[in-house]
Amino acid sequence: MGQPVASRGRAATPTIGKAMLNKYARAFFTRVLTPFAAFLIRRGVSPDTVTLLGTAGVIAGALVFYPRGEFFWGTIVITLFVFSDLVDGNMARQLGRTSRWGAFLDSTLDRVADGAIFGGFALWYAGGGDNNVLCAVSIFCLASGQVVSYTKARGESIGLPVAVNGLVERAERLVISLVAAGFAGLHKFGVPGIQVLLPIALWIVAVGSLVTLIQRVVTVRRESAEADAATAAENASQGSGAAS
């Protein structure tokens, strides 16, 4: 859902451009959504509930509309529910409940939502869209997006910084795909030729995800070798010190 703007407890290492965008976007959405978040708190709604409902909405938008070729309305529904990721983070901050659990839940459900979106594309191309190549590309986007996220999480779990974000992160994958899907859906309103945007976007996401995966694997390999060399040097130094 909304990684680039706000989430509960997740850290990021954006580029300067992304950091500037995040700064102004965060300030804007905080002003807009704070009253609504406060209203939900007064009604006894928890941040976790908002997270779960938001994910359910994204899944419904993707798997109900996209397989039928209703890309415009599906994207509208998904976009509306994506804002839940900003609301739950705002609520958590107001309640002083930012936690590891919230960060874990957000990240986990983000992966589920991503899978539903690209799964919806795959179902369309496997059915009414009748294009096996684009079905395969959609499945690749789904799988590669999950693996790209896993490489960073796994690298960090073994103590490596994984000091690279890569060419196409989750935010870029979603923006490219959803914007293209929304515009492609205008074909049903009589806009000719615009449906070609979605296949182009899927190819861009697929290639970008592959490049990002390679970037992260290479980075983890280099950092791992450096860490192993540093450990070996430290052990050798301690061994020589003990011998003397």
Curated annotation (Swiss-Prot):
Mg(2+) 1 binds at residues 85, 88, 106. It is found in: Cell membrane. Gene3D superfamilies: 1.20.120.1760. GO terms for biological process: phospholipid biosynthetic process. Contains a di-nuclear catalytic Mg(2+) center. InterPro entries: CDP-OH_P_trans (IPR000462), CDP-OH_PTrfase_TM_dom (IPR043130), CDP_ALCOHOL_P_TRANSF_CS (IPR048254), PIP_synthase_PgsA1 (IPR044268). Pfam families: CDP-OH_P_transf. Its EC number is 2.7.8.-. A CDP-1,2-diacyl-sn-glycerol binds at residues 48-51, 89, 93, 99. One of its GO terms (molecular function) is magnesium ion binding. Mg(2+) 2 binds at residues 85, 106, 110. The keyword Nucleus does not apply. It is an enzyme of class 2 (transferase). Pathway: Phospholipid metabolism; phosphatidylinositol phosphate biosynthesis. Keywords: Cell membrane, Lipid biosynthesis, Lipid metabolism, Magnesium, Membrane, Metal-binding, Phospholipid biosynthesis, Phospholipid metabolism, Transferase, Transmembrane, Transmembrane helix. PROSITE patterns: CDP_ALCOHOL_P_TRANSF. Homodimer. Belongs to the CDP-alcohol phosphatidyltransferase class-I family. This is Phosphatidylinositol phosphate synthase. The gene is pgsA2.
